[in-house]
């Protein structure tokens, strides 16, 4: 009988599962990821995906620490300097601006699939 031995098994190879696997791997833990679908490979002429995430500076630091950010840089991303959030049927809204906190950017907009591909590297 063949036995597999892992310190951790992660169910789901989305951005969160893959980021966790990267962090656990950085701690020297042997990690398995269970996922039924691998993201479509990246090609620069592809249309942009509709599913994107606004990555905060902390997310950027984590991706940089586990070696994924350099792969994102080789694909595509876009820094954002301002973000407005509002209620669809309400009157509340808030605007965040990088310049008001003395930063060049608030974070980066990245297609979710590109984050996944970078984490798989």
Name the predicted role of every residue range.
Residues 4-33:
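N-terminal Rossmann-like FAD-binding beta1-loop-alpha1 element of flavoenzymes
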Residues 21, 60, 64, 120:
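Short glycine-/small-residue-rich flexible loop motifs, especially phosphate/cofactor-binding loops
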Residues 46-88:
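N-terminal FAD cofactor-binding segment of flavoenzymes
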Residues 25-51:
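Glycine-rich FAD pyrophosphate-binding loop
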